Amino acid sequence: MSVILFRKQRDTEEELGYAESHCHTVKYRTECPPGSLVYGRYSVMPYYRELDEELRIRGSRLINTYGQHKYIADFDYYYDVAEYTFESWFDLSMTRYNGPFIVKGQTNSRKHLWSTAMYAEDKRRAVEIARDLRNDGLIGDQRPVFRKYEPLKTLEIGVNGVPFANEWRLFYLGTKRISQ
């Protein structure tokens, strides 16, 4: 049986309604029936590892194990897709490229503060942004990631200079595209 473990929040009520109308949805981990495949929605952080272990003890499992989550969240997947995505560095001394850059944490960014906390015209500014992100409550413990800025086709410019672009994400299982 598949179950969505959904932590209800004020800004996710509409999504919860859709989930409840299409899937078996629970609000508490203790409501997950034994033998369930559990999709965590707003419910796994900050105790992902503990949830993974607890569900396993109860005979269920998360759709993504804690290890799989860490592989994505810690940006460890980069080396597996490096030839297909924008060049990235964890240490700017490892590149002669001088900018522009996108600066973010391994997992999170401050995209809504594009012009002051994400986009850097050059290395000097990228280092400054990374230093400032160290004091950020959400990103401070994450390793900084410096990505080569590649301008995409901009559809419009939003608040704080955030470009809305024609960006596509494709998902594959092996060699078969399963979603876009």
Predicted regions and their residues:
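Active-site nucleotide/adenylate-binding loops and adjacent lid/helix of ATP-dependent enzymes
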Residues: 4-6, 32, 42, 50-166, ...
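Short, surface-exposed charged micro-motifs
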Residues: 169
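Structural motif
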Residues: 36-37
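Short, charged N-terminal beta->alpha structural module
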Residues: 1-28
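Short, well-ordered alpha-helical microsegments
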Residues: 12-13, 46-52
